[in-house]
Amino acid sequence: MIVTPKFRGFICTTSHPVGCEYSVMNQVEYIKNQKKINGAKKVLVIGASTGYGLASRITAAFGCGAATIGIFFERPGSKNKTASAGWYNSAAFEKMAKEEGLYAKSINGDAFSNEIKQKTIDLIKKDLGKVDMVVYSLASPRRTHPVTGEVFNSVIKPIREAYTSKTVDFHTQLVSETTIEPASDDEIRQTIAVMGGEDWSMWMDALKKADVLEDNVMTLAYSYVGPEVTHSVYREGTIGKAKDDLEATAIKINENLRTIGGKAYVSINKAVVTQASAAIPVISLYVSALFKVMKEKNIHEGCIEQMYRMFNDRLYSGDLKLDSKGRICMDDLEMRPEVQNEVTKLWNEANNDNVKDITDIEGYRREFFRLFGFEFEDVDYNADVDIEVNIEGLY
């Protein structure tokens, strides 16, 4: 099948198997070209198929030489429908890990469920005994509670009052004003249930009870703070409330892990292009301006560069450089005052006439397409490709 990008709103409904493999290969090569990290050896990544979760798995495997188990919920390909990008990413990762002689197995299913938690515990016991690192990097729009059965849906909305701001449609490159109505109390509650810390805590409880955590285990979850311009819709909005809950959960997990010397951290990561962030008005314009400034200053990072820096310079360097709230700050380059001042200036100036020139909207658009395996110069998109790809180590 010849695969081209197809869209439904902000969602790209197709993905390219060869392009996704090429993307993973680039990330693997980046890590293999860095100095080795004396770090984790047996790693569980919950949410391992895209973005920061995938980059964490690649860094652990190819940077630390770790055995990895990845949990994700992805769609395989069929005769006439491509798989989701995360499926192709995971297939490529497993293939490359195997070639390198690294242990890699994956479980495809709902990480929020008790069933997948148990399946993961069984696999750890069978193959690894215990794990010394657990990365929690789930990005899901909904969650079925494993105890009550309630289905929660997350929303990206401001709280208390409507928010009006500039945004840019990266398909048309048109700047416009958008207004987002505030969330109801129930929408806030549901967003916290999906994107807060409860499931992370449930995972760590289950893993500890099953005795599959090594002494001095480390667990990480990822968050974002960002600048003032995004706060109404992000940090002070519904997602921010969920992230507050996630950060509070780290304290609870620390208590729980104390008996085995374990530690839980939240890492505040930088803004990158993800399927999730593309759906947030305001973020696309902010990230386009941020890319422009950080690339000019030669401090731009994607997921993989950032995860290597986190593992090498923070987690296993002996100095986590925690902030006053006990968080790891990987947004340090993004939040430099000189970067933010320039980004704010570009933000204020951006309009339909100049957005292509003063921001990196083109770079943002290309990054978005690359999430699905498109727009890589070295991939032949006119070639007929097999869209049914197996993941070798699926358990």
UniProtKB/Swiss-Prot annotation:
Keywords, in A-Z order: Fatty acid biosynthesis, Fatty acid metabolism, Lipid biosynthesis, Lipid metabolism, NAD, Oxidoreductase
Active site: 234
Entry binding sites for substrate: 224
Site residues (Plays an important role in discriminating NADH against NADPH), renumbered to this chain: 74
EC supergroup of this enzyme: oxidoreductase
Entry binding sites for NAD(+): 47-52, 73-74, 110-111, 138-139, 243, 272-274
Keyword Chloroplast: no
Entry EC number(s): 1.3.1.44
Protein family membership: Belongs to the TER reductase family.
UniProt name for this protein: Trans-2-enoyl-CoA reductase [NADH]
